[in-house]
């Protein structure tokens, strides 16, 4: 159903385009440290851009909207595909600015997440997005966090110019394999999806080298103490993508973007870039998803990879049937595995194999790995290296540091470990203190598996059976409505509400 934007109010547009954006999960903490400035709105430092989350972990402190839900493409999995009969509308750049500034002044939001369907062409769509962001930064002096989805197939110049205005950019790969992409989005070219990712990476590296930093993005401190991590492999090699990322196409941007007020080079995508992959729409295994994730971190230095459990929205023989529950527990396990790649020194081919390509969703991936390597357990807490401690279920990066530091001053026992925050309900099956286990526990896979599943059963059920999925509203956070009373009106008039 086509309804002209002229027929819709700004509030009606907002309801449509905010709802259409809720399936995009690539929102996270800003990663920027830009302070507030005099005569400018917003900052990315004061309280942390993502201090508020919904029950399923999605960030709600950004105004997350689409520029438009119109689209020339017909991706089978997408609610906004051209063949769907939906109300279509598009924000103007000025309308986006109005929304961001007004919501920010009312303390509803701290930043903007902007994506879009493809209106007319990728370049035309990106031009509209660029106009909105440029106005926010220059006319409205908005200094808050901005995350923009780059449109594959757009011009290199637009991506370059946008990179100087935003904190984070991302390009959705959508699916982890070429076969999956051909099946559900045959019009999308894998090379065109990857090209802007490489261009953004080149721009980030050029800027970092220009200001005297290392080419690679900063990673967790824990990686410095690990002997082997995925980030130590495949060092960055510049691959040209056309025009140089630091050559501005628009000469008018020279003073406003390329140089800050203090004359230093302006940042280019300072919070890094991310991507998103849909899980459950096609038949890829967890191994394929995680292997693709590892390559993205290694080859493109992505800051984050996000996973989105597919919610059946369209009828199609190539998709799960309508009403099929989204694989939320599987999504949760992939996020946990992603954490192991980035902070714990694991690799995809360690966590999974061709023989066992999928995680046991009833166990967290670290427990799953430990149960398949019982030959190295139990680990002696008072002697194990930092690398080995990180591979013990129930011991995290901070806990491992505490153990290494504390045992320099004496022998540790289970009471000490409990005070340090070690999760003994998991760790007790895999560790000893001075050669003794916490209890007499048989080191058998079946026994330990039953115990761990029993302890985590309630949590697993809650993840897989959430309350009805709903993006939190900017207007009605608790999803209830009530009539305005005479007393309310009176309080409003006298400034008591």
PLM features: what roles do these ranges have?
Residues 97, 120-351:
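Conserved AdoMet/S-adenosylmethionine-binding subsite of the radical SAM
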Residues 1-70, 423, 431, 439-497:
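Flexible, acidic/Gly-rich N-terminal and inter-domain linker regions that tether
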Residues 320-390, 426-477:
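Long, highly charged, low-complexity intrinsically disordered interaction regions
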Residues 63-66, 94-105:
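Short, charged beta->alpha transition segments
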Residues 65-94:
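Canonical Radical SAM [4Fe-4S] cluster-binding loop centered on the CxxxCxxC motif
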Residues 101-115, 337:
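Short Fe-S-cluster ligation motifs
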């Amino acid at each position: 159903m086509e309804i002209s934007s002229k027929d819709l109010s700004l509030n009606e547009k907002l309801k449509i385009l905010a709802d259409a954006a809720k399936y995009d999960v690539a929102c996270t903490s800003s990663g920027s440290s830009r302070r507030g400035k005099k005569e400018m709105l917003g900052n990315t430092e004061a309280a942390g851009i993502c201090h508020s989350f919904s029950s399923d972990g999605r960030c709600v402190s950004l105004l997350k909207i689409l520029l438009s839900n119109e689209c020339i493409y017909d991706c089978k999995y997408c609610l906004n595909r051209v063949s769907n009969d939906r109300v279509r509308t598009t924000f103007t750049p000025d309308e986006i600015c109005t929304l961001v500034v007004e919501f920010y002044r009312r303390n509803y939001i701290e930043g903007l997440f902007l994506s879009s369907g493809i209106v007319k062409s990728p370049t035309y769509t990106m031009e509209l997005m660029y106009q909105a962001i440029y106005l926010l930064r220059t006319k409205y002096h908005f200094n808050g966090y901005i995350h923009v989805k780059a449109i594959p197939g757009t011009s290199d110049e637009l991506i370059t110019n946008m990179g100087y205005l935003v904190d984070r950019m991302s390009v959705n790969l959508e699916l982890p394999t070429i076969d999956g992409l051909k099946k559900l989005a045959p019009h999308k070219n894998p090379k065109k999806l990857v090209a802007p990712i490489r261009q953004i990476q080149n721009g980030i590296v050029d800027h970092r080298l220009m200001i005297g930093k290392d080419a690679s993005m900063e990673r967790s401190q824990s990686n410095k103490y690990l002997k082997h991590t995925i980030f130590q492999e495949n060092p960055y090699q510049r691959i040209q993508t056309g025009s140089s990322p630091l050559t501005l196409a628009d000469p008018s941007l020279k003073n406003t973007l390329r140089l800050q007020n203090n004359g230093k080079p302006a940042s280019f995508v300072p919070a890094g870039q991310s991507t998103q992959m849909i899980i459950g729409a096609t038949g890829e295994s967890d191994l394929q998803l995680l292997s693709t994730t590892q390559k993205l971190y290694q080859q493109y230095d992505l800051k984050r990879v996000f996973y989105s459990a597919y919610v059946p929205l369209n009828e199609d023989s190539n998709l799960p049937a309508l009403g099929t529950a989204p694989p939320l527990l599987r999504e949760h396990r992939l996020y946990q595995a992603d954490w192991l790649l980035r902070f714990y020194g694991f690799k995809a081919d360690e966590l999974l194999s061709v023989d066992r390509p999928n995680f046991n969703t009833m166990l967290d991936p670290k427990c799953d790995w430990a149960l398949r390597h019982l030959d190295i357990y139990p680990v002696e807490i008072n002697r194990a290296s930092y690398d080995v401690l990180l591979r013990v279920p129930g011991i995290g990066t901070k806990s491992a540091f505490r153990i290494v530091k504390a045992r320099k001053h004496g022998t540790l026992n289970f009471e000490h470990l409990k005070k340090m925050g070690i999760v003994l309900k998991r760790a007790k099956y895999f560790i000893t203190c001075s050669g003794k286990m916490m209890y007499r526990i048989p080191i058998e896979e079946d026994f330990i598996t039953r115990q761990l599943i029993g302890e985590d059963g309630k949590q697993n059920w809650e993840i897989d059976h959430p309350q009805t999925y709903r993006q939190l509203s900017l207007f009605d956070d608790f999803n209830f409505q009530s009539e305005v009373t005479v007393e309310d009106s009176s309080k409003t008039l006298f400034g008591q509400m």
